[in-house]
A protein has these predicted regions:
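Short hydrophobic/aromatic helix or loop-helix immediately within or flanking a transmembrane segment
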Residues: 1-7
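ER/secretory pathway lumenal C-terminal domains and tails of membrane proteins involved
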Residues: 13-24, 36, 51-52, 57-66, ...
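Interfacial loop-to-helix junctions that mark the boundaries of transmembrane helices
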Residues: 27-32
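Short helix- or helix-capping micro-motifs
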Residues: 39-47, 99
Length: 981
């Protein structure tokens, strides 16, 4: 990242010199100081922006990608500076090589190409014309398409076709055809470069040489294939042959999304799209299979600019972000008659006025379907409201105006994650009152306010460059738009992204920081005009004044970007691995659950006996193959289905309940494996597919193996059931679920199986056969009905207590210098980190060991203190209840009132909201009141009169509970007052 800032500094100083030396003027000492000031202010401003700083300390590709962006822009400016020299084209050749090299980092760097083309055009042209601009735009688009759509995918694809011939027809080894093609292609380009140079064909020589350099840089991907061929334990997509590499580069796993023309989320399907794919079979030959690659849609449901396209996204979120309207209508019964009240008056209701309704006959012979499609206006509303405003301009203002908090908002709410200036009257216009803030909001380290200063200086610099140097202004604007708004159009984002995406637009913020730097020149000119004095004082004063911008960025962003003392990202993976038994299989989902485990195991060598299985990948044949093999010290997963049953087939497996009894799981898997035509389901088109003949299954329990493997203690033998009965609450299962059933059918209780997320078990009907081990759930043959979503599985305090007190690590969260940001708090919540202490403590209370229970509760609050981890019902209520149950009422009262004061602060604050803003926080007030009520009921049940008195005083100040019967002062616990679940 240091080099990124260095190249940005040089870029800004170059552009500043172009402004100051126009018409051949010489640089004076004052000008040199001004130039250096522009570079320092702009580069330092970008250094301390929220998005860039976050990317700089994140283990991701975007930091290196930013460096490539800054480097190629600076190199093109170096060419522009030396364009008249004999060997100036070497800069363009170097840029071509770096472009090819950067493809291996991220393709976002290609978006600098339009700016580079215009630098070339402006340098080579004295008179700018509309035709020249249009031609330059077309050329830049052609170069983009050539690299992104031809070089990146099709060089590999053509090599794959050669490999197909060499392997299947000539019997040569895999990748021999690819090697032949690469050598032939590079050789042909080399010959072309030689002869065009010899014949003086300068332009063609430059094109061929640049193409050759792009390919040489792009050849860094060879390391991916070489690594994959070595079969390492982690081998994503297994690109060990050119067809697999082509699929990886073509991003097949992400699917397609419409950009300018296509269907919307409600469009019906009229058929499937098919494509041929080739893969290596067990005999070492390529096989070809036709697979479904997407859906066909009727022509009448294809539209321009389909922004609301994702059928898997939340329809309600699409509607809320598209500024839908409501209208008043009459309530009608099932017969269509108007519903009337006792006086005969019609009932009026608010009806969603969204989309247009189209009748569509699907050819089935039934009544036409009513399809509700978003209108073009609603698509535009969604584009401007969500995709542009929420997913770009909000991020832009985060970086140059300020940020409300580090909490990711859900839908269009005003309480979290918005931009914030620090200027009270402006912020109150759209975020509500800014006085009387709750402590958690006021003290959120992600709450950063810059008072519009970076934005205003950048705007001044933008106008200044537009006025003084319109050519270079257009170049910076190309960078700003292509790496910002153009990406918004390209990504066509669906609502409710799993994480904030501001890092994608770092290149656009980089461009704006160029204008921040150039704003120093404008301020310098203003000082000269005001003082009527030229000399060193004006640029020095301008630089000092403008240094306020990077200064305020650094001061405000320092605390929430300081990752020192924090080790939670590593420790959470350690905890997951340490929570499982020896030789276990741990099954998880998604990035946050998996990458920390992989790091601990592959880098730090933690628990090599454990096999990690990510269900997000379990639908891919390469991952199933990988799981079958030994990794580190862990044996493969006991899958038994052959490759023919999961390689480009059985993505969805129907369930037909034709067997009126629970099938033993082995029988069910054998039924899938069977090739007898009688075990196939015949579709309407005559094709035959595998299916399951029942949704009820029996999993026999080998009690001796369960005890020998440590799954169950000998003392709990009598608690084990003989058979676990599963019932799948669905009509189909996907490939990952099919493979999980295969594993369960054949593991024979010889290896412990742990899960990090209970939803995986919910889909398999296993929620009542779990043991919570703190961070993971162990599959056990002991029936344990669930009491609530927060208390799933049984607890063995003898097993979990040493883990909680001696083994687990807590990321140094207890240190007040450690910043527990939104991601840390989310992961702690998902892993039930603090709740583990309370659940274990409750088991000790049941045993009669109150001392140990209190010790665990104290340790939970010590390791993960409320001052660092935000209060929630899930992570606080069990501790209060635990203290009361363990006979420590004073500690329970203290924690209860701390949480109550937190809730009261929020309620007091949100009750100040008025009008539409008040409507937007109504549900939040209700949620906080319900939490406060839970605390009241608990205090009443426990007979805590002092606490009740304080809570009743608060309720009276609100004036919302005038009737004392709602919240009575109970002198003794009453059976009529129950602790709500």
């Amino acid at each position: 990242m240091t080099f990124c800032i260095l190249f940005l500094f040089w870029t800004i100083t170059h552009l500043a010199r172009r402004i100051l030396t126009r018409q051949g003027a010489e640089l004076t000492k004052a000008n040199i100081v001004a130039v250096l000031g522009t570079g320092a202010v702009g580069a330092l401003a970008y250094t301390f922006t929220d998005t860039f700083w976050f990317s700089a300390v994140e283990g991701e590709v975007y930091a290196l990608s930013s460096m490539f962006t800054a480097l190629v822009v600076w190199l093109m400016l170096k060419w522009e500076e030396q364009a008249d020299q004999p060997h100036s084209m070497r800069w363009i050749v170097l840029i071509a090589y770096l472009m090819g090299l950067s493809i291996g980092v991220h393709i976002l760097n290609l978006l600098t190409i339009p700016a580079l083309v215009f630098i070339y055009y402006f340098r080579k042209t004295q008179r700018i014309t509309f035709k020249g601009i249009a031609v330059s735009t077309l050329i830049s688009g052609a170069i983009l398409i050539f690299i992104n759509s031809i070089i990146i995918p099709h060089t590999v694809y053509i090599g794959a076709l050669f490999d197909l011939f060499f392997v299947n027809s000539l019997g040569l080894p895999v990748n021999s055809g690819l090697v032949f093609f690469v050598v032939a292609l590079l050789g042909a380009l080399g010959v072309g470069v030689y002869f065009t140079h010899k014949k003086g064909r300068t332009v063609l020589n430059l094109v061929l040489l640049s193409t050759l350099m792009i390919l040489i840089g792009y050849s860094s991907y060879a390391s991916v294939t070489i690594r994959a061929a070595a079969n390492p334990p982690m081998n994503s997509n297994n690109p060990s042959n050119p067809f697999a590499l082509y699929s990886l580069l073509n991003r097949d796993q992400y699917g397609d999304k419409p950009l300018l023309y296509g269907p919307q989320f409600s469009a019906p399907t009229s058929g499937y799209k098919y494509k041929d794919v080739r893969y290596l079979d067990d005999d070492g030959k390529y096989k070809t299979v036709s697979i479904i690659s997407g859906y066909e849609h009727p022509d009448e449901f294809m539209h321009l600019f389909p922004r609301m396209w994702n059928y898997a996204a939340s329809k309600e979120s699409y509607k809320s972000w598209s500024a839908y309207r409501t209208r008043t209508d009459y309530e009608r019964d099932e017969n269509g008659e108007i519903v009337r009240d006792a006086q005969g008056r019609p009932n009026k209701i608010e009806v969603l006025d969204f989309g247009r309704r189209t009748l569509w006959d699907d050819g089935s012979g039934y009544e036409p379907l009513v399809i509700v499609e978003p209108t073009f206006r609603e698509n535009l509303n969604y584009f401007f409201t969500y995709q542009l405003n929420h997913m770009y301009w909000r991020y832009f203002l985060w970086n140059f105006v300020g940020r409300q908090s580090d909490i990711q908002p859900t839908d269009a709410i005003i309480t979290d994650g918005n931009w914030l200036s620090g200027i009270k009257w402006i912020d109150e216009l759209y975020l509500g009152p800014q006085d009387n803030l709750p402590d958690e909001i006021a003290n959120n380290k992600g709450r950063n306010t810059y008072y519009f200063l970076p934005f205003l200086l950048g705007l001044i610099g933008l106008i200044y460059q537009l006025n003084r140097d319109p050519r270079n202004f257009s170049i910076v604007m190309w960078l700003f738009v292509m790496m910002g708004i153009a990406l918004v159009v390209y990504f066509n984002t669906s609502p409710n992204e799993p994480r904030e995406r501001d890092y994608v637009y770092a290149g656009s913020f980089y461009a704006f920081c160029i204008w921040i730097g150039l704003g120093v020149l404008a301020v310098c000119d203003l000082i000269v005009w005001a003082t009527r004095r030229k000399g060193l004082m004006a640029p020095i004063a301008a630089t000092v004044v403008c240094m306020v911008v990077p200064g305020i960025l650094a001061a405000q962003n320092w605390d929430d970007h300081d990752r020192s003392h924090r080790t939670m990202a590593r420790d959470i993976g350690w905890n997951y691995l340490q929570s499982v038994l020896p030789n276990a299989i741990i099954i998880n989902y998604g990035d946050n659950d998996t990458f920390p485990l992989w790091f601990n195991q592959e880098v730090d060598g933690v628990r090599p006996d454990v096999r990690i299985m990510n269900t997000s990948y379990l639908g891919a044949e390469w991952y199933i193959d990988e799981l079958k093999t030994k990794a580190n010290d862990a044996p493969g997963i006991p899958f038994t289905l052959p490759r023919s049953k999961y390689t480009y087939t059985n993505d969805m497996l129907p369930i037909e309940n034709i067997v009126d009894r629970p099938l033993e799981l082995k029988e069910a898997i054998d039924f899938i494996r069977n090739e007898d035509p009688r075990t196939k389901l015949v579709l309407s088109n005559g094709s035959k597919i595998d299916y399951l003949p029942s949704n009820r299954f029996a999993l026999p329990v080998n009690k001796d193996n369960a005890i020998a493997s440590g799954i169950v203690k000998e003392s709990d033998r009598d608690l084990m059931v003989d058979t676990i009965y599963l019932e799948l609450p669905k009509r189909t299962i996907d490939k990952s679920e099919m493979m999980l059933l295969d594993m369960l059918a054949h593991f024979d209780w010889k290896r412990p199986i742990h899960f990090t997320q209970v939803y995986i078990l919910q889909s398999l009907g296993l929620l009542n056969y779990l043991q919570f081990d703190g961070y993971s759930y162990r599959l056990v043959p002991i029936y344990t009905p669930n009491r609530s979503v927060h208390e799933i599985g049984r607890i063995d305090p003898d097993y979990i207590t040493p883990l909680l007190t001696e083994t687990f690590r807590y990321g140094n969260i207890a240190d007040p210098r450690t910043y527990a940001d939104y991601f840390i708090q989310y992961n702690l919540s998902a892993s039930k980190a603090r709740e583990s202490f309370a659940r274990a403590a409750k088991e000790y209370v049941f045993r009669g060991d109150s001392i140990q229970a209190i010790r665990l509760l104290d340790m939970g609050l010590e390791k993960l203190p409320p001052q660092q981890i935000r209060y929630t019902d899930a992570n606080t209520f069990p501790f209060i209840e635990g203290y009361y149950m363990a006979g420590a009422p004073d500690k329970g009262d203290s924690l209860l009132m701390s949480y109550a004061r937190n809730l009261m602060q929020y309620i007091d604050y949100y009750l100040d909201f008025q009008g539409i803003q008040g409507d937007m926080v109504t549900q939040t007030i209700i949620d906080k009141m319900q939490s406060l009520d839970r605390l009241y009921y608990l205090a009443a049940y426990m007979g805590r009169q002092d606490v009740l008195a304080q809570l009743n005083d608060y309720y009276r100040t609100l004036g919302i509970y005038e009737n004392e019967l709602i919240h009575p002062d109970l002198s003794t616990p009453s059976d009529s007052v129950q602790i709500p679940e």
